[in-house]
Amino acid sequence: MKHVARGRTITLLLAVLVVCRPASAQIDLSGEWSVVRAEDNVGNTELGDWVGIPMNEASRLRSTAWDASIQTLPEWQCRPHGSAYISRGPSALKIWNEVDPVSRETTAWHLEWLRSVDRPVYMDGRPHPSPNAAHTWAGFSTGEWVGDMLRVRVTHLKEEYLKRNGVWHSDKIELTQYLIRRGDYLTYLVIAYDPVYLSEPLVRSTEYRLNVNQQIPPYPCTVVNEVDRPKGVVPHYLPGTNNDIGWFSRKYGIPMDVVTAGAANMYPEIRAKIPRSMGGSGPEPPPQPATQPRTQRPAPRAGQQ
């Protein structure tokens, strides 16, 4: 009888421990969030700004062919921003959770930005679909808690831009995202892996601040004829014809071989290639030869044109 009583006591204690175990460190991420601008997320990008992106040669060739006028095509005007880019734009963010009515557990988080689509993050452990499954602007997302951080894996994304200056990612991209809340601030960290256009992972982060007065409005979009151009014309540049690529380099005095260095320009050692007068530690460029003044063309004589 003593053994039976002892067994019952142990069973009861185990049951109490199970019932009274501390809840897993899950943070409430729901709310309306406004983007916080900082030095690493300043809004509109500039032509030829490839600094800080591990672009490979295929990515550089694709970027030099890009023409901003492609956004005026009817097929492009109402395209939503994809999951790899949207957090870098100016759009506000709304997060809410989906709760199982019986267990009261969160089965999915939903993330939606203005000018984007609802992106569910499934928390029920379901597997990602086949690589041949449909790819969408939002992709397919699953999440799990790592301490007090929500880690999200995103696959099945359509090909789209990483930056709105012609830097692209392929449909083979995979994202690892971390959502970290600290009071009224939310850090949104994105790590992008793309075997087609990136030579190594691209890491970017965005800060959001809770905004209780914010409400993301609907975003209806109507396709119109913005530019009168011949049917079938797609704006683009052929190789070697895009003179705007060097604009960023000329504006800020950054050598073009630094701008196009790919992964190398993400690390401090690249300063050795930047002249001291431009904030680096490298040698000054050789002086440019003096420009010869143009000879003034004589005025045409009477009867000449």
State what each model feature region is.
Residues 1-3, 16, 57, 296:
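Coiled-coil-like amphipathic alpha-helices with heptad-repeat character
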Residues 1-11:
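Bacterial N-terminal signal peptides that target proteins for export
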Residues 3-5, 18, 85:
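Short alpha-helical segments used as structural interaction elements across diverse proteins
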Residues 9-20:
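Bacterial N-terminal signal peptides
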Residues 24-305:
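PEST-like low-complexity, intrinsically disordered acidic/proline/serine-rich tracts
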